[in-house]
Amino acid sequence: MRILLAAAECAPMIKVGGMGDVVGSLPPSLIKLGHDVRVIIPGYGKLWSLLEVSNEPVFRANTMGTDFAVYEAKHPIHNYVIYLVGHPIFDSDQIYGGENEDWRFTFFASATSEFAWNCWKPQVLHCHDWHTGMIPVWMHQDPEISTVFTIHNLKYQGPWRWKLEKMTWCPWYMHGDHTMAAAMLYADRVNAVSPTYADEIKTHEYGESLEGLLNYISGKLRGILNGIDLDEWNPAKDPVLPAKFSINNLKNRTENKKILQREMGLEVNPKKYLLGMVSRLVDQKGVDLLLQVSRRLLAYTDSQIAVLGTGDRYLESGLWQLALDYPGRFSVFLTYDDSLSRLIYGGSDAFLMPSRFEPCGISQLLAMRYGSVPIVRRVGGLVDTVLPHDPENNSGTGFCFDRFEPIDFYTSLVRSWEAFRHKDSWELLQKRAMSQEFSWQRSALEYEMMYKDVCGIKEPSPDVAEVEKFSYGQSADPSLKKG
């Protein structure tokens, strides 16, 4: 099959979250299955120097009242074809935000549609999050191109329909209050990035006011778990790790722990229980829970905590204050550093993910791969990937809690600290975590099944009367509804 992935990110060149990992790492696994897979992304400023880009465009056109050109490049690691949409609107390296964000990504979706119609025509056009949400709408009446829409994070839903109507051509048949809703209605298949998240978003608690619509389309909705690149993330070969190790040789891991402690200003003592966190510092990731339990944990146990990331100012300030109050025991680096993140995965004893919601999560997969035992809230993809530790039966791969409450998180932390003191059983727990297999090849087989299922098929137009029931979401203010 000819498959084109359209997205705002593609790792490692352009990456903010998990979407970048999916778009960057899924194509090689699909190519191994015999498919012609290519990616199209905006031509952000730095890409022109990072990649070897064709001198001449492969396609020129006009859309939304402005000219654009598409250039061909190759992925720097996997060597598959990447198309860059060239236009001055993408010249900066800013991916998200800004006053023109809605226009920027609607234009990208429109340019991608023109390219797919008139240059390289795929059988399946795989769209990712609201940034490409208009593509399934425009492709709806093209019988030769089937569309798949992946929900990475339902919270971000794109511009409202009235704004889209001002910016660009909206088909007469279009329904859905905003880009995300329209994409889900008109895509031929929809998937979330884990089976549990696919179920959760059909409920009021996690549906972001789209639960009614998601139940309406549930027949074409499924969950496919993300994976990781096992070659790129291999503690036995990772060039960044000072000490390489494997599931059969964990002794070297202690050296990484000591170096991590030194680099982050913690007391260098491998006997201390070291908790790591690599995350965007936002409410979704449960950083506020960490702020609420850290003082009590540090008072009761001899634990150390190392945090790496950036995010909301008030959360950064809270973490910084803890570092000032507990020197040598609590450390935070308010930046993102790939080398340091790998050292946290490969040197910490346990890894923190107390998320409010988690569509899939990549960090817990990396942590387990590198022998850092995950401590997670049982939500979204964390349910599908982390098995609760059961000391009586010597089973499980991490520590789990259910409610988003400080006491529940704290209890899991203390349980893990107590387990850490029993070195033999802790090493068995580490090895069970490291033995889990979350490769992209497994995920690619599921995507291939979905592509084959949808190839050459167009879903019927949505029932207008049914769609109107979900307009503006079940929890929205009815007074906002347009006539």
Swiss-Prot record:
Pfam families on file: Glyco_transf_5, Glycos_transf_1
Superkingdom assignment: Bacteria
One annotated GO biological process: glycogen biosynthetic process
Key word Thylakoid present: no
Keyword Cytoplasm found: no
Pathway of action: Glycan biosynthesis; glycogen biosynthesis
Enzyme kind, highest EC tier: transferase
Family matches, as Gene3D superfamilies: Glycogen Phosphorylase B
EC number, UniProt record: 2.4.1.21
Entry keyword set: Glycogen biosynthesis, Glycosyltransferase, Transferase
Molecular function terms, GO-annotated: alpha-1,4-glucan glucosyltransferase (ADP-glucose donor) activity; alpha-1,4-glucan glucosyltransferase (UDP-glucose donor) activity
InterPro entries the UniProt entry points to: Glyco_trans_1, GS/SS, Starch_synth_cat_dom
Protein residues bound to ADP-alpha-D-glucose: 15
Catalytic activity: [(1->4)-alpha-D-glucosyl](n) + ADP-alpha-D-glucose = [(1->4)-alpha-D-glucosyl](n+1) + ADP + H(+)
Function description: Synthesizes alpha-1,4-glucan chains using ADP-glucose.
Family recorded in the similarity comment: Belongs to the glycosyltransferase 1 family. Bacterial/plant glycogen synthase subfamily.
Protein name as catalogued: Glycogen synthase
Organism, as annotated: Prochlorococcus marinus (strain MIT 9312)
